[in-house]
Regions:
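Short, charged/polar surface micro-motifs in flexible loops or helix N-caps
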Residues: 49, 66, 76-77
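Metal-dependent nucleic-acid phosphoesterase active-site entry motif
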Residues: 2-10, 106-119
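C-terminal structural segments of small proteins and small subunits
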Residues: 74-112
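Acidic, metal-binding active-site segment of PIN/NYN-like and related structure-specific nucleases
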Residues: 45-62
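Ligand-binding "clamshell"
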Residues: 62-70
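Structural signal for conserved beta-strand scaffold positions within catalytic alpha/beta enzyme cores
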Residues: 26, 53, 71-73, 104
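N-terminal first-folded block
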Residues: 2-49
Length: 119
């Protein structure tokens, strides 16, 4: 699966996703580091990638057509907790099921929203 990880995702997660066979774009390794959310969104859609972030602002795109959004929102985040929640979500859904899905992973629960525009 093609995945884009925002700057706030642990490097251990990037490595684990690559070891699982995913094609991962890590913005930290590009000249685009620090780009605006709208520009990140446009790039992710152009490249047909699942977006993984801790930035709740990306939830605003949930009703648009997209290739999946995974937002991790924890009360006391640390890289190990963020990593665990991401790996759990990635293994829970197949690549085809991510299309048009927003998942918010919290400490003990997860929320799932399906886009109104899942074309």
């Amino acid at each position: 699966m093609k995945i884009f990880v925002d700057e706030n995702i642990p490097l251990m997660t990037v490595r684990a996703l690559r070891e699982m066979g995913h094609i991962v774009t890590d913005i930290r390794n590009t000249p685009d580091k620090g780009m605006a959310d709208d520009d990140v969104w446009a790039m992710v859609q152009r490249e047909k990638q699942l977006l993984i972030t801790t930035d709740k602002g990306f939830a605003q795109y949930r009703n648009k057509q997209h290739h999946g959004i995974l937002i991790v929102r924890l009360r006391k985040p640390n890289r190990h907790k963020i990593h665990q929640r991401i790996i759990k979500a990635i293994t829970q859904f197949s690549e085809k099921k991510w299309h048009g899905i927003l998942i918010v992973m919290r400490d003990t629960v997860q929320g799932v929203w399906r886009s109104a525009d899942r074309n």
